[in-house]
Design a protein with these regions (language model features):
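Membrane-interfacial loop-to-transmembrane-helix junctions in polytopic alpha-helical membrane proteins
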Residues: 1-7, 66-73, 95-102, 153-163
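Interfacial segments of alpha-helical transmembrane regions
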Residues: 2-13, 88-114, 191-194
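N-terminal signal-anchor transmembrane alpha helix
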Residues: 4-30
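Hydrophobic alpha-helical transmembrane segments
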Residues: 11-15, 72-93, 166-176
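Long, glycine/tryptophan/cysteine-rich extracytoplasmic
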Residues: 21-73, 119-159
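Juxtamembrane membrane-water interface segments of multi-pass membrane proteins
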Residues: 22-29, 95-100, 175-194
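A hydrophobic membrane-anchoring alpha-helix module
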Residues: 158-185
């Protein structure tokens, strides 16, 4: 692999280490009665922000309360991020293209699985409502947006990556660039090697002049 690709991979791996301790995602809630806003912070290993206030509000509309211990993801996610941080660094140091390919496909697969898991949690959180809630709006669901803005009754909900999330996404984008560069470079090398093998064979098969006919042979 190119030297600058290897350096970028090592830097990405080092940048992923603080992600373990930073919030990866945030959901901001804005309403007239809360002009300063409420914020739910999602860390790799816990929930943070105004969790208690949000739980109190959600109780009235029948939503489940949020507790870190209810999510197995918070147990394994810090280790997965640590694994990818180490994988980035090792790949950059060793410099093997196949290692980078494996890293790329694992990283993309993890990202897609994480997005699906987050969407599934939001769906269950917003649709599985208690029938004994103090406030029931027929046909109303309170699923937060996966990303972007959504109006939920008198609350405006904004769902966006936080510090750790942006670092994680940036590492993925840099990995994609490195993957494309090395894939194209490997393709050019393969074509050049094929030509280097085929051209001498082709030239050797061509005669420089007419050959005499050998009686009893030709």
């Amino acid at each position: 692999m190119k030297s600058w690709v290897r350096v970028l991979l090592v830097l990405c791996g080092l940048a992923l280490v603080p992600v373990i301790f930073l919030p990866m995602w945030r959901i901001d809630l804005v309403a007239p009665q809360y002009p300063e806003g409420l914020r739910l912070l999602i860390y790799p290993g816990k929930l943070g922000g105004n969790v208690d206030i949000i739980n109190g509000l959600n109780h009235y509309i029948g939503m489940k309360t949020l507790h870190t211990e209810d999510f197995i993801e918070f147990t394994i996610l810090p280790y997965l991020i640590g694994f990818f941080a180490a994988f980035f660094v090792v790949t950059g140091i060793i410099g093997k293209r196949k290692l980078m390919y494996a890293l790329f496909f694992l990283f993309v697969s993890f990202g897609l699985l994480a997005i699906y898991d987050f969407w599934r949690w939001e769906y269950n959180y917003g649709h599985n409502l208690s029938p004994d809630a103090a406030i029931i709006v027929p046909g109303m669901a309170y699923q937060p947006p996966l990303i972007g803005f959504k109006q939920l009754l008198n609350f405006g909900a904004y769902s966006i990556p936080d510090q750790g999330g942006w670092i994680f996404v940036s590492a993925g984008a840099i990995l994609l660039v490195c993957f494309i560069v090395e894939w194209r470079r490997a393709s050019r090398i393969s074509k050049g090697l094929a030509m280097a093998i085929l051209v001498p064979v082709f030239l050797n098969s061509c005669s420089s002049g007419p050959q005499a006919i050998s009686p009893g042979v030709d």
